[in-house]
Amino acid sequence: MDIRAAEITAILKEQIQNFGQEAEVSEVGQVLSVGDGIARVYGLDNVQAGEMVEFENGTRGMALNLEIDNVGIVIFGSDREIKEGQTVKRTRAIVDAPVGKGLLGRVVDALGNPIDGKGPIVYTERRRVDVKAPGIIPRKSVHEPMQTGLKAIDALIPIGRGQRELIIGDRQTGKTAVALDSILNQKPINQGTDEKAKLYCVYVAVGQKRSTVAQFVKVLEEQGALEYSIVVAATASDAAPMQFLAPFTGTAMGEYFRDNGMHALIIHDDLSKQAVAYRQMSLLLRRPPGREAYPGDVFYLHSRLLERAAKLNDSLGAGSLTALPVIETQANDVSAYIPTNVISITDGQIFLESDLFYQGIRPAVNVGLSVSRVGSSAQIKAMKQVAGKIKGELAQYRELAAFAQFGSDLDASTQKLLNRGARLTELLKQSQFSPLKVEEQVAVIFAGTNGYLDPLPVSKVREFEQGLLLALRSQHPEILEAIRSSKEISKDTTEKLTKALDAFAKSFA
């Protein structure tokens, strides 16, 4: 038998080349103790802060406390099946969520998993849920209006695309209703073809009842608004870490639109419950408590979340993310810890009052305490033209109404102001699920500030408004079209509108 050394060498070399070490190394730790949704783990020495870890039974958690001898992990889900001594392994991934247009029309949990029974989600990419907000250079000042469809807000407390406007008030004052109407009002724009005008909506429900969230989704579906919306739900029965994470997940989904030259609106309903969930986690992790037992970094929690809402400059695609955070107060106390924090972070607040709500003024916006720090730069010119006057007249009305209670002998001009104020207040009332287009709001407010409501009894104002809108839509659509296209009330439009109002006022009387 002839053995060739060269041949054997070649075979050996080939064997050595193909020899691969099929061993997978994963870093693991051991559960020291578990309870109240918190696990203490020994051995994960190289774990990162905010990293996702996986327990033996497949449950996931996030490493939050990195201490000398152990790691504090918050558990996303139930801790019942996790036992002392079980292994925990690193995933080497910071908590992320799926993003993209494939999520539109879906209801997901705080980790981006579908919970609506409509099958798996088709997503574009995955993004980290907690990222750094854009700096000063990438931003641009807010200048495009974000119409809510509510006269009281669009005229007096305008919101721009890229703004953060807080909705604050006691329970049952219509905070969610304002947010819902803002979503419904985007339907006509989103049915168009102009991608730059569309506004995609993300609604984050934190700590709410499942029935409430189901009702909200049902309304969106019935009104045809679910197709451009994403609902992120961490309900009251979900673990505190899920309630803490949901707003970050929703923001990551909104940022996808912002960073790709589109516009998005995110509603956090509500951040008081997120703060409570964060307080619970922090106390269980034995972090030192501060004011009202909240941890010292609860301000940073909300500021890093809300700073991600921004209007980007043209070189980055001019996209925007508008945030409407909701805060629930106790007995109208806006000076509590969380309300003052969020007021100082946002660019203004819409203050809803239970007293006004019970008087039948809905939306129950307290115009005196509410403010938009972006102001009229977030309004079209037509709205600026009519809103300036209504603001002034309502301010005078509020001032005089306080004095009018003391004396009955008021002069004619004061009486006239009081009458006008009462009618304008009535005019700003609006039913739920009936947002108005901006040109219709302009026409209605024009009628109010030009004295067309003064001869009417207050009880007839709403009827007059409905009749006027019907008349304008059917007989004078060109007036509304002129306001919509030119975005201002020109001299010609003023004449036409005055003529139409005179004719309608005569027929109404």
Swiss-Prot record:
ATP binds at G169, D170, R171, Q172, T173, G174, K175, T176. GO terms for cellular component: plasma membrane; proton-transporting ATP synthase complex. It comes from Xanthobacter autotrophicus (strain ATCC BAA-1158 / Py2). Keywords: ATP synthesis, ATP-binding, Cell inner membrane, Cell membrane, CF(1), Hydrogen ion transport, Ion transport, Membrane, Nucleotide-binding, Translocase, Transport. Its main location: membrane. Produces ATP from ADP in the presence of a proton gradient across the membrane. The alpha chain is a regulatory subunit. Gene3D superfamilies: 2.40.30.20, ATP synthase alpha/beta chain, C-terminal domain, P-loop containing nucleotide triphosphate hydrolases. It catalyses: ATP + H2O + 4 H(+)(in) = ADP + phosphate + 5 H(+)(out). GO terms for molecular function: ADP binding; ATP binding; proton-transporting ATP synthase activity, rotational mechanism. It is a peripheral membrane protein. This is ATP synthase subunit alpha. The record marks S370 as: Required for activity. Belongs to the ATPase alpha/beta chains family. The keyword Transmembrane does not apply. It is found in: Cell inner membrane. Its EC number is 7.1.2.2. F-type ATPases have 2 components, CF(1) - the catalytic core - and CF(0) - the membrane proton channel. CF(1) has five subunits: alpha(3), beta(3), gamma(1), delta(1), epsilon(1). CF(0) has three main subunits: a(1), b(2) and c(9-12). The alpha and beta chains form an alternating ring which encloses part of the gamma chain. CF(1) is attached to CF(0) by a central stalk formed by the gamma and epsilon chains, while a peripheral stalk is formed by the delta and b chains. Signal peptide: none annotated. HAMAP family: ATP_synth_alpha_bact (MF_01346).
